[in-house]
Amino acid sequence: MKKIVLFVIGLLLSGTTLAQDEIETTISGDIVSNYIWRGQDLGSTSLQPTLGLGYRGLSLSAWGNVGLTDPADTKELDLTLSYTIGGLNVGVTDYWLSDGLDPEGRYFKYDAHSTNHLFEANIGYDFGIASLQWFTNFAGNDGINKDDKRAYSSYLEVAVPFQLSAIEWTATAGAVPFATDYYGTNGFAVTNLSLQATKSIKITDSFSIPVFGQVTANPCSQKAYLVLGFTLHP
């Protein structure tokens, strides 16, 4: 009996070690001068922390946003479950914002017509020279269309990474295919044209800080933004 117990303990310990070796942990935080998302202005200077776990293509992550200068800025907590195999990726995100259908901003309130949660599914493919993503809201606090019905608000985005002068660049174009007040569109509309540059600043031999700048234009709303930010991570 004692030998069996020791064998089971040894097996569990070896399994734990193996799992720890294969599980990837992400801990980071962005500081941004302006919270711009898919061409929309969602807040002023903000802290945006990330905590995630990944295992063989499967990942679970939490992402948040809190305003640092304006108390009226909406707080946000998003949970994403995704799977990547080769260039293909699929995922589901639960967005929660403090401002929504529930005036009390309760997190654990999921009633269809009084929740601050929004659920979105996505599918995409990374071709190497460019990536393509499609997102659709399927439940929760979604927008409405011209017929005052659930819009199943969707967003399509193409991103092209490239390197120039030892700096990592990404050019992005995003569009909303259907009418929805969630994105403020009356039909197909280009809502996001952005260019981001990122460069890591070396602090010590083992620590550097990625700094990024991004210019974004929203042709639909006729707005433009310039954002500066940096990322902290172990």
Segment roles from a protein language model:
Residues 1-24:
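Cleavable N-terminal export/targeting peptides
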Residues 19-24, 91, 161-170, 198-211:
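Short loop/turn motifs that connect adjacent beta-strands in outer-membrane beta-barrel proteins
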Residues 23-25, 43-47, 73-77, 115-119, ...:
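Residues that define the transmembrane beta-barrel architecture of outer-membrane proteins
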Residues 109-180:
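Detector for outer-membrane/organellar transmembrane beta-barrel domains
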Residues 160, 195-197, 201, 222-234:
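Outer-membrane beta-barrel "beta-signal"
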